[in-house]
Amino acid sequence: MGLSDGEWQLVLNVWGKVEADLAGHGQDVLIRLFKGHPETLEKFDKFKHLKTEADMKASEDLKKHGNTVLTALGAILKKKGHHDAELKPLAQSHATKHKIPIKYLEFISEAIIHVLHSRHPAEFGADAQAAMNKALELFRKDIATKYKELGFHG
């Protein structure tokens, strides 16, 4: 399931665009996630009060968390599949503290793909979308393995 060098290049090319505005992209991803899958909002005590898209757009905390999420994902993507060291603490916190099911990681992956396509259509065509989907699938597969090692079957 690994990615070719060319696929990783497509992923990292568009990620360069994301890094120019991590907080903005992250906020858009979280808004898309919460609007598309409102049940995911229940995992975030500090965001539960955000009921409308306007509330979410006005939230500096949501923007900060979006930045945190995409910073962590960027560090993982840049490892081109050799992300064990980056994945371990993330799996630990998401399995034992936050109890985030793998299904929710699928939901946020869909949100990431949607946001990247809407914000960067020229750089995120079909090939880049397929490569990013593959990279996010690899991430989910590997984090699911770590979850099982930790005894979490979410």
Swiss-Prot record:
The keyword Heme applies. Residues 2-148 form the Globin domain. Nitrite binds at H65. It is found in: Cytoplasm, Sarcoplasm. One of its GO terms (biological process) is removal of superoxide radicals. Monomeric. This is Myoglobin-2. The lineage of its organism: Eukaryota, Metazoa, Chordata, Craniata, Vertebrata.
